[in-house]
Amino acid sequence: DWFSYLKIEIMKIKENIFLGKKILIYGLGKSGVSSFKFLNNKADVYLFDDDIKKKLNLGLRQKIKNLKEISQIRFDKIIISPGIDIFNCKLSKILKKNFLKIHTDLDVFYSFFKNKSITITGTNGKSTTAKLLHEVLLNQKYDSRLIGNIGNPVLAEKKITKKTIFVIEASSYQLDYSKIFTTKYAVLLNISPDHIERHKNLKNYVNAKFKLLKSQSNQSVAFINKNDPIINNKIKNNSLKQKIIKVDILDKNKILE
């Protein structure tokens, strides 16, 4: 009923870690700008980008601060774009010092929306899988939204209802920086040493991908590739809470529970 719904909404507000906080959004690409638009009337928001001059035409001039101003402000939260390498950027010292305050737009999304979500990650095939799944859900008349690395930034969606389902393509960088994001359904397609780059080594890259699975509760489900040796080896050495469903891609995608 309406009263129960109101109680749930009030609880969500009490639990929200971003409402009313002093927040720095670092990186003014698509995800950074959408984070600003979403949070601007919910928190005290400031902006920074390594290339400030290029970003002054976004109509956000009064909110953009320079390096000296940023270093003098005590922020509660720092939301960074996944493209930023915290060890090689203009705010590197500040980010290292405030590492526990770093979040992503995925964290903001999760703190405001508790809808069912299906989050897809892996080295290869994320976009194709996300698109296919989104099309299947639309075909079955679900209110599906394709967001993340593909489609809209996660905070740019409008007219969200309780029935909205989110199909999220998540990169290892997004997952690595996220602190509270979790998902009802996780899909881990594969892991290979193709996109290690900023992660420095395979171990860090694998750990970033596995954050998606480690964050899940016992009410969640993870679909993993039975034929991927790196995934299977990591699964053996982790006590995961959720239901694990293995998909055999070499045998007509047979499902093994």
Q: How would you name each of these model-derived features?
A:
Residues 13-21, 26-28, 59, 81-82, ...:
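Adenine nucleotide phosphate-binding catalytic loops in nucleotide-utilizing enzymes
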Residues 51, 68-70, 108, 150, ...:
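Short, solvent-exposed coil/turn elements at secondary-structure transition points
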Residues 45-49, 146, 167, 246:
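Short beta-strand "acidic-cap" motif of Rossmann-like dinucleotide-binding folds
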Residues 2-104:
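N-terminal leader/targeting and accessory segments in enzymes
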